[in-house]
Amino acid sequence: MAFMDKSEVRQRLQKVLQQCAKAPTWSPKEEVRQSIFWKSIRAELIGSLVLMVFSCSRDSIYGPVSYGCTYAILSYCFKSISAHFNPVITIAALLLRSITPFRCISLVLAQTLGTLSGASVCYYGLSNETETGSAPISPVLNVSPAKGFGYEFFGTFVIILTMSSYLDCNDYVSESGDSNLLPLIFGLSVGLSSGMARQATGGFLNPMRAFSLALFELNHWSNHYIYWIGPIFGCLLAVFTFDYTRPIIPNRDSNNRINFPTFNKNNKYEVEMQPETEITLATLA
């Protein structure tokens, strides 16, 4: 087995540090003073609520289709602000150096509140005890825990790998208009992954979504950890896979400046922060 010499080790370490330096370093005080921060909080709260309401059906066909279509619509509506609606996706954005830890925690809290509110609407406002099909889906495993982990793991892996081009702070989208197709692609990945795992685990692929629905059915806590470790490990592997397979050549304009996509929050966010702080993407890079 060949070992790397010291110069090669230093070069690889330098590349890692350069990538980490491109992460946003805004302080919590700077972030809370910007309107885009609070807009992203509202977008995640409203989006998580609507997504929960439209994706809680027990039907094995309508449920995944509604889940994917609703996600595509919400992603299109909030694509220039924040369109995660899933704590695992927000964690992936943090690992890909697209958001700060403070913003990650804030978005997860907003998603939690929105998901819990949506679950309350499903159980107390939309469900009908006299109609079996109208009851919200329950986080119950229909397979062994190991197989349940596999379904949640691979389903989340596909979703995060698909969305990494949107979450990556160093990624770019050409001006050909391909970014308009991203919400549709995201919706397809969510719907197909949820449909794949529907019969086995319910196709939640979202720890907070499973937790919110389990709160209303106290007898459905057995093997609940599967709905947490499966998506989290799937997220970690997807981020690792994308981080080591993505193209590293950025797109540049006529002035030799890197073009960041409008679908990436860093560009829009940095523009709004410009008047109040000297931190820019140029200095971070």
Swiss-Prot record:
Motif (NPA 1): 86-88
GO biological process: renal water transport
One cellular-component annotation, GO: plasma membrane
UniProt keyword terms in alphabetical order: Cell membrane, Glycoprotein, Membrane, Repeat, Stress response, Transmembrane, Transmembrane helix, Transport
Pfam families associated with the record: MIP
Subcellular location(s) of the protein: Cell membrane
Presence of keyword Repeat: yes
Glycosylated residues (UniProt): N128
InterPro entries noted in UniProt: Aquaporin-like, Aquaporin_transptr, MIP
Primary location recorded for the protein, binned into one broad class: membrane
Transmembrane segments: 36-56, 76-96, 105-125, 143-163, 177-197, 225-245
Gene Ontology MF terms in the entry: water channel activity
Membrane topology value: Multi-pass membrane protein
Sequence motif NPA 2, location on chain: 206-208
Regulation: induction: Transcript abundance is low and expression levels are not significantly affected by desiccation or rehydratation.
Annotated family: Belongs to the MIP/aquaporin (TC 1.A.8) family.
Domain notes: Aquaporins contain two tandem repeats each containing three membrane-spanning domains and a pore-forming loop with the signature motif Asn-Pro-Ala (NPA).
Purpose: Probable water-specific aquaporin that may modulate the water content and osmolytes during anhydrobiosis.
Record protein name field: Aquaporin-6
Taxonomic lineage of the native organism: Eukaryota, Metazoa, Ecdysozoa, Tardigrada, Eutardigrada
